[in-house]
Amino acid sequence: MAASEHRCVGCGFRVKSLFIQYSPGNIRLMKCGNCKEVADEYIECERMIIFIDLILHRPKVYRHVLYNAINPATVNIQHLLWKLVFAYLLLDCYRSLLLRKSDEESSFSDSPVLLSIKVLIGVLSANAAFIISFAIATKGLLNEVSRRREIMLGIFISSYFKIFLLAMLVWEFPMSVIFFVDILLLTSNSMALKVMTESTMTRCIAVCLIAHLIRFLVGQIFEPTIFLIQIGSLLQYMSYFFRIV
């Protein structure tokens, strides 16, 4: 994601510069040489608009975030990657604790230290399996072997849906919310992969689905009851919804 790697958010064509700055607060957005449209209109957008478009899975905003928003001249990409990995694992540990919290037997039978060790081992093992399987699937289905760090950075950035789990610190939600967050995480990862590889959406979904499925299966080795809790909560929520309708 060097400076020369800026992309037009509309067509994905490489552009040399996104804007010309005449004075502080006075800029002119550059046009793409391929589609003749403004290369990146998100430069002048508020962060809330960018966040909303990310939730809506718009390819334009994914190109903006993955290619144009990070300036390698001022940001250490390697440090950013490690920070994202730490945040990702931390939120994953919280997700695991939320699911275990609904399992009363596990919550009361395990000591805090033992529970922490179990959660940490489970999260690290599941995510190691996710990264390995994702790399293998990407190489096999998309023939992408030269941009592993860039692609993994994009996957961690597109996992922003995990921050919605923090809302469960304040408000009480059914455990099925975690299931919906996982689905949105899968679709967001697929969109980011499509934008970065310019492959078909079907192949990108297949890669992410394989990686997430293997991650889930490895996670079940350490806590097989979590899946039953999640599915049970989802079925309970759906039955309640249909009764209202």
UniProtKB/Swiss-Prot annotation:
It is a multi-pass membrane protein. InterPro entries: Arv1. It comes from the Eukaryota. GO terms for biological process: intracellular sterol transport; sphingolipid metabolic process; sterol metabolic process. One of its GO terms (cellular component) is endoplasmic reticulum. The chain crosses the membrane at residues 70-90, 117-137, 163-183, 200-220, 224-244. Its main location: endoplasmic reticulum. It holds the Pfam family Arv1. It is found in: Endoplasmic reticulum membrane. Restricted to tissues in which cells are actively dividing or expanding. Mostly expressed in roots and flowers, and, to a lower extent, in stems and leaves. Keywords: Endoplasmic reticulum, Lipid metabolism, Lipid transport, Membrane, Sphingolipid metabolism, Transmembrane, Transmembrane helix, Transport. Belongs to the ARV1 family. Mediator of sterol homeostasis involved in sterol uptake, trafficking and distribution into membranes. Also regulates the sphingolipid metabolism. This is Protein ARV 1. The gene is ARV1.
